Amino acid sequence: HRDLHSFPTRRSSDLHNKKYYSKYKKWCDKYFYLPHRGETRGIGGIFFDYKMDNWEKDFLFVKDVGITFAYLVKEIVRKKMFLKWTKKEKEIQLLKRGRYVEFNLLYDRGTKFGLSSGGNPEAILMSMPPNANWK
């Protein structure tokens, strides 16, 4: 997935600003880092929020990144949708889901804000996987 994912993301970022990909990749790697594990989540990518430089340019950038993301997801699903999971792959998936839970509950700003400000816990925690494992 890494090649399929990083090249189009870099290309769509570079169309708007040659510094965006490097800047937002570093932000992604930092934001999605699990310090208690010494590891990052996922396979990389870009991350940004509160982008308020120039509304029209920012909108076009976000739109292009969204179109690229939709394309990438479609391609990955198309290539993988009929593959069978091995027992080992399922174990890895459950461990990755565990890392997702850890990140969301310990570090994600949106989750922390929602839970600390009296938000509806059911709605906030709805993204939690139904099954996860830890080692």
What spans do the regions from the language model cover?
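Short, small-residue-biased leader/transition segments that mark boundaries at the very start
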Residues: H1-S12
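Intrinsically disordered, low-complexity terminal/linker regions enriched in Pro/Ser/Gly
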Residues: R11-C28, P35-R37, W134-K135
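Aromatic/basic-lined ligand-recognition segments
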Residues: C28-M52, G98-Y100, L105
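Active-site acidic/histidine clusters and adjacent loop/turn architecture
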Residues: H16-W27, R41-W55, L60, D64
